[in-house]
């Protein structure tokens, strides 16, 4: 029986062609293969990967395998899988469980499958959003007697998660506890997952070391900002074919993702307004030339609404009922609770096409909801370009190597890769875009207190 679940394995040839192109745009990952391939630093690592199953992720998976790892993979979002990418990886012999448009029940079943190594126990997690880590740690707590944790689900997602935990406990008593003990470490890709890790550590519930990949400069200041700058408008266009020039767009949040999103919409000609709770980010938005407003003041007039905050209930039902006819509502934060989609379930829904729904309000006005409030750049398009993802995923590879080869040196907690590796990741991507670095003279380096080779900035420097 085939150890994979994909939409159509016949898509593998198409996926391989796109994967080959992506490799030419991902110099960091290819450099990792060249540098570390001979030494096989991940030999013995059994990595459970939960991250969007895209063409770019396929290059990451094959890099991890080239460095000696055994890998099983699922997507971290029900809409983000590129089916031809999943097929290419499955055809190459990697167990992958990912289908674009999978149900929430299937999502958690597939998350369970990435831990089911036929030989040996999973000992590493590569996570995006923290669901794989959550699954193991929550299950272990329930096995320890905290059954109240899964007694009262508050969402459809929790219903499916809790049912999957119960199913695994019946099939394999004690499995979660054994699995938790075997994990040497986790590397986390995104802001939301990092928040979860810090919260777990604060509560004394993180039993192994974790590397916060998101806050590597070459991730958050590039993937989050420049990636969103290209992929947000791509998703809106593919979903709606609407002309954005002249439209009023509201971006909720002005962190790195919000900055990239606002720039994306401005570049398309939209008149962009920003909402913020943080006075520093609000001041940045204003000085970048955006009008900073509260949502209630613009909700009736704007054409496009995008959430980027990582928080819950940012756009609520009362906001959507005030929106103009055919307003577009979407999210580019990791989870689907930034928009109160559950509150819309009793309204009239008309599916326009995959991941595009028209919802009628009691007033008769309609809104266009993208990807059911999940990541629209991956649900309605194909996510960030390969080049920027190369920087993010090179950090992931380095984090996995660090945890696997030096895990004994780390106590449970959340760590960041050293500045020297951050600069290395950036350096690996310069030649591809024709960048030439100036070299400090020894006297200049001494004058500013650094070495000629770097690192060039202190750990507290804010890029």
UniProtKB/Swiss-Prot annotation:
Coiled coil: none
Cofactor, free-text remark: Binds 1 NAD(+) per subunit.
Top-level EC class: hydrolase
Entry keyword NAD: yes
Residues at which NAD(+) binds: 190-192, 224, 253-258, 276, 311, 332-334, 377
Pfam families: AdoHcyase, AdoHcyase_NAD
Subcellular location(s) per record: Cytoplasm
GO biological process: L-homocysteine biosynthetic process; one-carbon metabolic process; S-adenosylmethionine cycle
Binding residues annotated for substrate, in chain numbering: 54, 128, 189, 219, 223
Alphabetical UniProt keywords: Cytoplasm, Hydrolase, NAD, One-carbon metabolism
Pathway annotation: Amino-acid biosynthesis; L-homocysteine biosynthesis; L-homocysteine from S-adenosyl-L-homocysteine: step 1/1
Cofactor field: NAD(+)
Enzyme Commission identifier(s): 3.13.2.1
HAMAP family: AdoHcyase
Function: May play a key role in the regulation of the intracellular concentration of adenosylhomocysteine.
Similarity section: Belongs to the adenosylhomocysteinase family.
NCBIfam families given in the database record: ahcY (TIGR00936), PRK05476.2-3 (NF004005)
Subunit text: Homotetramer.
Matching PANTHER family: ADENOSYLHOMOCYSTEINASE
Protein name: Adenosylhomocysteinase
Organism of origin: Rhodobacter capsulatus (strain ATCC BAA-309 / NBRC 16581 / SB1003)
Lineage, opening ranks: Bacteria, Pseudomonadati, Pseudomonadota, Alphaproteobacteria, Rhodobacterales
Gene that encodes the chain: ahcY
């Amino acid at each position: 029986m085939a150890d994979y679940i994909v939409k159509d394995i016949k898509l593998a040839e198409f996926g391989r062609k796109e994967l080959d192109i992506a490799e030419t745009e991902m110099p960091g990952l290819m450099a990792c293969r060249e540098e570390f391939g001979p030494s096989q630093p991940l030999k013995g690592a059994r990595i459970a990967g939960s991250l969007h199953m895209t063409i770019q992720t396929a290059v990451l998976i094959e890099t991890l395998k080239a460095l000696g790892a055994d890998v099983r993979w699922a997507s971290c979002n029900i809409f983000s899988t590129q089916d031809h990418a999943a097929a290419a990886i499955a055809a190459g012999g990697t167990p992958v469980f990912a289908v674009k448009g999978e149900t929430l029940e299937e999502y958690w079943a597939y998350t369970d499958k990435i831990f089911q190594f036929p030989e040996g126990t999973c000992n590493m997690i590569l996570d995006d959003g923290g669901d794989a880590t959550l699954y193991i740690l929550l299950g272990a707590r329930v096995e320890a007697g905290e059954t109240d944790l899964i007694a009262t689900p508050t969402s459809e997602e929790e219903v499916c998660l809790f049912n999957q935990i119960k199913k695994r406990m019946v099939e394999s008593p004690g499995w979660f506890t054994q699995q938790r003990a075997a994990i040497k470490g986790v590397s986390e890709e995104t802001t939301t997952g990092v928040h979860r890790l810090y919260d777990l550590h604060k509560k004394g519930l993180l039993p192994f070391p974790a590397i916060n990949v998101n806050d590597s400069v070459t991730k958050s200041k590039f993937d989050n900002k420049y990636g969103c700058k290209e992929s947000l408008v791509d998703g809106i266009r593919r979903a709606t074919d609407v002309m954005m020039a002249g439209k009023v767009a509201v971006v909720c949040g002005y962190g790195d993702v919000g900055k990239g999103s606002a720039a994306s919409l401005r570049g398309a000609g939209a008149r962009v307004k920003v909402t913020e709770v943080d006075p520093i980010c609000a001041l940045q938005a204003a000085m970048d030339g955006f009008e900073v407003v509260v949502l209630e003041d613009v909700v009736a007039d704007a054409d496009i609404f995008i959430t980027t905050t990582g928080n819950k209930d940012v756009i609520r039902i009362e906001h959507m009922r005030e929106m103009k006819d055919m307003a577009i509502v979407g999210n580019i934060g990791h989870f689907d609770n930034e928009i109160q989609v559950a509150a819309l379930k009793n309204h009239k829904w008309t599916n326009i096409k995959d991941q595009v729904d028209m919802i009628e309000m009691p007033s008769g006005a309609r809104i266009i909801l993208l990807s059911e409030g999940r990541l629209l750049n991956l649900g309605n398009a194909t996510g960030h370009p390969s080049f920027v993802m190369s920087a993010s995923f090179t950090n992931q590879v380095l984090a996995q190597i660090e945890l696997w080869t030096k895990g004994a040196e780390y106590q449970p907690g959340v760590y960041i890769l050293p500045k020297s590796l951050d600069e290395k990741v950036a350096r690996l991507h310069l030649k591809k875009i024709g960048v030439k670095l100036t070299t400090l003279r020894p006297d200049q380096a001494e004058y500013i207190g650094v070495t000629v080779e770097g690192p060039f900035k202190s750990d507290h420097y804010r890029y």
